[in-house]
Structures are given as C-alpha cells and as structure tokens.
C-alpha cells in the first residue's frame, strides 16, 4: 500500500528518487503515466497491466473510450528504478505536470502521484476545506 507525502528533488537529468519505502514494491518495473489534475501516476507494472486490460474492454465504438485508451497508451512510459531508486521522467511528462526541481510524491493507496510542489500546495489549498464534505459525497456510507 502506498501512503504518505514525500518531497524528492528532480535533478538536472530529469531523474527523481522514489521514496525508499516503496522501492521493493516497484522493483519489478513501474509505469509512469499522465494522470488527472496535471499530475503523474506511478503504478507497479502488474497493477498497470490490470488497469489497461480493464480499460481495453470498453467498446471501441465509444469515442470517449477510444480517446481515453489513446491517451493512456501514448502517455505511459515503462521505467525500472536504478540502484539508487531513481527513475527518469520524460520531457513530455515533466512538461505535462509542470515539474520544477521541487516535487511531491504522494501515496494514493494503490499507486503514487508525482506533483510539482507548488501545484500540490495550490491543490491542497483549494481542496482541504472541502475534504469533509467531499468524503461524505464521494464515499457515502463507507466511512
């Protein structure tokens, strides 16, 4: 399970060091893909394969499904962390997420998200006040 908030730096070569506590879960390979709110999602390879299989079952006659599958496939990059736990984020991914040197990696239960630190702070300011209401609306009787 991926939990917590971490603040790694992006180096000049576009490399980001993954939090040490997640490296074992990601050692078999990982998939970096464009996600919502201009963040990046990092999935263990096996979890991403399951997600892609489910998504590919959508009817190809549906234009939204086709667009989603195209964006998912085109916006995904397979990575293997190096011996220091670093992954290289593509220029396209860095541009999409507006990543600067200061990044935030958050655990999102079954995957990680990578954010630009300022974008994450802005997101938090907007959404923190509505956290209680959102949990009631989105999660209903679960909590």
Curated annotation (Swiss-Prot):
PROSITE patterns for the chain: SPOVT_ABRB
Top-rank taxon, per record: Bacteria
Swiss-Prot/TrEMBL keywords: Cytoplasm, DNA-binding, Repeat, Transcription, Transcription regulation
One Pfam family this sequence matches: MraZ
GO CC terms, sorted: cytoplasm; nucleoid
Localization (cell): Cytoplasm, Nucleoid
CDD domains: MraZ_C, MraZ_N
Xref: InterPro entries: MraZ, MraZ_C, MraZ_dom, MraZ_N, MraZ_sf, SpoVT-AbrB_dom, SpoVT-AbrB_sf
Example GO biological process: negative regulation of DNA-templated transcription initiation
Gene3D superfamilies: Transcriptional regulator MraZ domain
Main location: cytoplasm
SpoVT-AbrB domain span: 5-47, 76-119
GO molecular function ontology, one term from the record: DNA-binding transcription factor activity
Entry similarity comment: Belongs to the MraZ family.
Subunit structure: Forms oligomers.
Misc. comment: Was identified as a high-confidence drug target.
PANTHER family, per database record: TRANSCRIPTIONAL REGULATOR MRAZ
Protein name: Transcriptional regulator MraZ
Gene: mraZ
